[in-house]
Swiss-Prot record:
Organism taxonomic ancestry: Eukaryota, Metazoa, Chordata, Craniata, Vertebrata
Alphabetically ordered keywords of this record: Cytoplasm, Cytoskeleton, mRNA processing, mRNA splicing, Nucleus
One GO biological process term: cell volume homeostasis
Gene: clns1a
Protein name per the record: Methylosome subunit pICln
InterPro entries recorded: ICln, ICln/Lot5/Saf5, PH-like_dom_sf
Known function: Involved in both the assembly of spliceosomal snRNPs and the methylation of Sm proteins. Chaperone that regulates the assembly of spliceosomal U1, U2, U4 and U5 small nuclear ribonucleoproteins (snRNPs), the building blocks of the spliceosome, and thereby plays an important role in the splicing of cellular pre-mRNAs. Most spliceosomal snRNPs contain a common set of Sm proteins SNRPB, SNRPD1, SNRPD2, SNRPD3, SNRPE, SNRPF and SNRPG that assemble in a heptameric protein ring on the Sm site of the small nuclear RNA to form the core snRNP (Sm core).
Region of interest: Disordered: 88-112
Primary site of residence: cytoplasm
Family: Belongs to the pICln (TC 1.A.47) family.
């Protein structure tokens, strides 16, 4: 299988060294080897010094899989946002790439590769997973950082303010605001205040919550009680404010 290459094992920042770990890439077993969970990348090498290495930004998911129906042994499951293939598969893929793009212009699905790391000691899965989490956190998704920078608030320039170069908004008190109204505006404001005053004075609240006028008259033999709403009726309701 030509996806394996020779490279020196990582020496710095190794959080977890797991010998006797079988690698299964895309359903094909590669035999036992050593898994290196390092801060820079995730690497696996067999006894001949051949293996593969993954960069953390390319890893979209890692988890402990205990579902023996999906795979007969418990393992560390890793999903990669690329297609790991041998040399023959890569050449065939490159030959058909243009034809596939012309036929499937609307297909935006990203190729993925499923990798399973099966340790000899299943009790080590928890520490393997924790080491993966720690190393993955050192390589945040750059798209998340870009989304955080999409909105930037206006900066307050202290130096410009001291030099009088900043337009400071003008605020008025209620009385000062009235003095800036035109005659027509003052008349409109007075009319609105009168309407609001009349509306409050004639307020009648239905559903038995509160009334300031006479109680409702019975109609068609039905008794309408002008009482408080039953306490606790909506205590469990989650209201968005």
């Amino acid at each position: 299988m030509n996806l394996l290459s020779s490279f020196p094992p990582p020496a710095d920042g190794v959080r977890r060294l797991q010998p006797g770990t079988e690698a299964v890439v895309g359903g094909r077993g590669l035999g036992p080897g050593t898994l290196y969970i390092a801060e820079s990348r995730l690497s696996w090498l067999n006894g001949s010094g051949l293996g593969f290495s993954l960069e953390y930004p390319s890893i979209s998911l890692h988890a402990i899989s205990r579902d023996t129906a999906a795979y007969p042994e418990e393992h560390l499951y890793v999903m990669v946002n690329s297609k790991l293939a041998d040399k023959e598969d890569k050449e065939a893929h490159m030959a058909d790439q243009e034809e596939e793009e012309s036929e499937d212009d609307d297909d935006d699905e990203e190729p993925i590769t499923e990798i399973r790391f099966v340790p000899g000691e299943k009790s080590d899965l928890g520490e393997m997973f924790s080491a993966m989490c720690d190393c993955q956190a050192l390589h945040p998704d750059p798209e998340d950082a870009d989304s955080d920078d999409d909105y930037e608030g206006d900066e307050y320039d202290v130096e410009a303010h001291e030099q009088g170069q900043v337009d400071v908004p003008t605020f008025y008190t209620y009385e000062e605001g009235l003095s800036h109204l035109t005659t027509e505006g003052q008349a409109t404001l007075e009319r609105l205040e009168n309407m609001l005053s009349n509306s409050i004075g004639n307020q009648h609240t239905m559903a038995g919550v509160r009334t300031e006028g006479p109680a409702l008259e019975p109609e068609d033999g039905m008794d309408v009680e002008n009482t408080q709403t039953v306490a606790g009726q909506f205590e469990d309701a989650d209201v968005d404010h």
